[in-house]
Every structure is written in structure tokens, then in C-alpha cells.
Amino acid sequence: MSDRFVATDADGLQHHNGHRRRWPLPVLEAGGWRPGDVVEPDEHGTPVVLDADQLLDELGECVFLAEPAGEAGAARLVAATSWSEKQAAAFALDCVEHILEIVPGSAEAELPDGGSLGEIIASARQYLDNGTSTDTHRLGFVSRIAAARRLRRESTAIGDAAFTAAAQAEGQGVDIMSDPAWETLAAARDAVLAAVEAVRHVAFPFLAERETRRYEAHEERKVAEVDQVDTPWGRFAVGGAGPKYAPSWVAARDAAERSRQAAADLNGPPAGEAERSWQVGRLVERLRAE
């Protein structure tokens, strides 16, 4: 039987089909992992464990190995995988690099401020691997476009003036990337934007931690005034009302999904399924990374 997984937040809370379930976490001891306590079926049904293909659509902050235990339908977490913010961003880049090799002309497609999709992904990979890049300004520009486009796509009300101003400042780039000339490369473009968002989350964990908790809680209430934080990628707004940046695992899901769509757009549904199969294999490699 292949491995089974459970995706949770850092506290062991799983979100699945509108239900939340708390899993006791395994503990790493000197002799190896001590499994968490068994989770029994409840009023919401049996505990949900996933194979690697199912996990691709339900990536979370943490991913644990799980196994059946006790009565029928019960399960427990037995060990953590190697999944992390950095592995999520690396997986997003894996998906995008693979699809840029497949879709003709996608790697050479130019960004609003110059450069190409292929170049920005190479810069993002360099930053993720080495913590530095010669193209940090463009990485920041693209990550802000990514956030603004996602908020526009989700019809999310941006509830504070500071972030609204920041989104407007990137507005020209957002609009240019909506131009009909991008139509045939739309899915590849969106995959690139999602991957850069994932790397931004890793690059600046002090932003990521705050936004991650807000994203998980779906906070909408007014909180402390917005902070403008200067980083090597430029200025970012944090705080205010509502989450503004997707966590790295959400961006990784988006990058994978849009990469599959790019393959399907090019060569039909079987190509999208083939891309999914490749992604599942790569995801398992990331989960097992040392």
C-alpha cells in the first residue's frame, strides 16, 4: 500500500470540505518518531487520510505520514515529512520550470518591466537556493503583481488605504498582464506568479508568519494599523483588514494547478493528466527530501 498523508496547520488542525479536525502530532524522540494518539470516527465521519494524488489538491502548512489504527476508520499520524515553507516554494518552482519547458514561447514571454517568465523563475530559484539574487527588484515587482491579481480575481475587498495604494502602484503591470496578447500563455503566466508568491513567503518569514495566521483564520475585523515594511524586494504592506498574501503552500497548489491547465490548453486533457502524474511524483520526492 502506498503512503497516506494528512495535511494540517502547525498545531495539527486539518481543514477538509468545510470541516476541521484536530490530530495529535507525532513526536521526534532519540529513537525515532513516536506516533500521535489515534483519531476515531466522529459525527463528521471517519478521519480523512490522503494518497499523494489527493494531497496535491489539499497541501497545507505541514504534511504528516498517517496509518490506519484501532477500529475501522481510525487513524493516527506516525511521522512528519520534509514538507516546509521552503519545500512548498521549491515544489511550485519545479512545476513552473517543467511547464515552461513544454509550452512553446512561454519562457521567453516578456514581463511588464522587461525580462521574461523564464528569467524571473531562474531568479526566484536562485533566491530560494542561495538567499540572494541579482534581480530582487523584479522579484518584488512580480510578487506584488501576483498578490494584486489574485485579490482582483477573488473579488476581495482590500480594506485598507495603504495596501490599496500599493496595488494601484502596480496597476499598470497588472493590466498589462491581462492583455489579450497573454491569452495563449495565461495559465503559464499565472503559474509563474504563484511560484514567485511562494518564494516571497520563504524570503521574508517575518511577513509570512503574520500573513499565514491571518489567512488561516480568515480574519476580517479591523486590526492594528497597516505597517509598511521595507525588504530587499521592495516595500510590502502587512496588517490592516483581511489577508493579503497567500501562504506558500496555497501558492504551490495554485502553481501546480495552473501548470496542469497550461499543459491541457496546449495538448488537451490527457496532457493535463500527464502533467498531474509528473507533479505527484515530484511532490513525493519533496516530501521525502533529506
Q: Language model features by range: what are they?
A:
Residues 1-290:
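Short, glycine-biased loop/turn motifs at secondary-structure junctions and
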